[in-house]
Amino acid sequence: MHELSLCESVIETIMDNVRTHHFSQVRRVRLTVGRFAGVETEALRFSFDVVARGTLVEGAELELLEEPGAAWCFDCSETVPLMDRLDPCPRCGGTRLHPTAGTDVMIKDLEVI
């Protein structure tokens, strides 16, 4: 379950910012989760709550925003939207695709006090 290690990294990054900017509490965390990131959202939510315990992030609302998938098609030389990483190019039907979007998990923003 790599969601646990993802949450550990997210909480560590948030706590670094909390200390740097002297925030007293984190109320909301918005994460962008790519369609191709291979993240199970329920496992991510569970892991977030577990890892946040005992920190200033504990009790914060976790909002997950899905980043759509896209890929560069080597056959038609276009960047195309994809619903599934294994789908063929919707433009030409090619299967030689390299993902260009939807592979990351990123902190979009925080609501803090």
Curated annotation (Swiss-Prot):
Question: What keywords were assigned to this record?
Answer: Metal-binding, Nickel, Zinc
Q: Where does Ni(2+) bind?
A: H2
Please name the Pfam families in this protein's record.
Answer: HypA
Q: Which GO terms describe its molecular function?
A: nickel cation binding; zinc ion binding
Q: Name one GO biological process term.
A: protein modification process
Tell me if Metal-binding is a UniProt keyword of this record: yes
Residues that coordinate or bind Zn(2+) = C73, C76, C89, C92
Q: What protein family does this chain belong to?
A: Belongs to the HypA/HybF family.
Function text = Involved in the maturation of [NiFe] hydrogenases. Required for nickel insertion into the metal center of the hydrogenase.
**What is the name listed in the Swiss-Prot or TrEMBL entry for this protein?**
Hydrogenase maturation factor HypA
**Organism of derivation:** Beijerinckia indica subsp. indica (strain ATCC 9039 / DSM 1715 / NCIMB 8712)
- What is the gene called? hypA
